[in-house]
Amino acid sequence: MNKLILLLSWFIISTSVSAQNETNLKGLETLAKQGDLSAQIELANAYRKGIGVTQDYKTAVKWFTLAAEQGNSDAQYNLGIMHSFGLGVVPNYQPAVKWYTLAAEQGDPLAQYNLGRLYYLGKGVPENLVYAHMWAKHASSNGFEMDAELAELLKELMTENQINEANRLEKEYEIKRYKTCFVNLLNE
């Protein structure tokens, strides 16, 4: 008898939770369609991970794209990953480079790392040790420790002129980022 009560309780609770998830999902979709960035990100992640919905990479790409077009670096990074690995899209490094670049320019260390790797490997962009090193250094300075090792390995493959050029580009990039941050603060 206790097992039957426990089973019925579990069924009632799971049905209630399922109905609540469906209601929450519909509410999120409504907000996302209205351009709500947080809802778009939450829906994209739900579809990417299969949380509360059936995993659907194509739908995740749709919602990440809408959020990325609003300038969200997390969505841009995720689109880079999805294009790199062919999740919901045909694998293609060129759009991956586009999305990684947009996120990397906003200071996303994982996007900077992946962008540096693509420049090193020449995938989606011409092989370029200078840019690979520059992005590896940025990722490292933004807390991604693996890129410090990559930057050092790249230095061994580079000429002194290439290292100097990478350092110059890195400084230019940092100045540009600081100026952008300052302008954004003034506009708030």
Positions of predicted regions on the chain:
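Sec-dependent N-terminal signal peptides
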Residues: L4-T15
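N-terminal segments that cap or nucleate solenoid repeat domains
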Residues: A19-I51
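Short helix-capping/linker turns of helical repeat alpha-solenoids
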Residues: K33-D36, K49-I51, D56, F64, ...
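Hydrophobic face of amphipathic alpha-helices that form TPR/SEL1-like repeat modules
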Residues: E42-K49, N78-F85, V89, N114-L121, ...
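TPR/TPR-like alpha-solenoid repeats
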Residues: A46, A67, M82, A103, ...
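Terminal, low-structured helical/coil segments at or just beyond the last alpha-helical repeat
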Residues: E145-E188
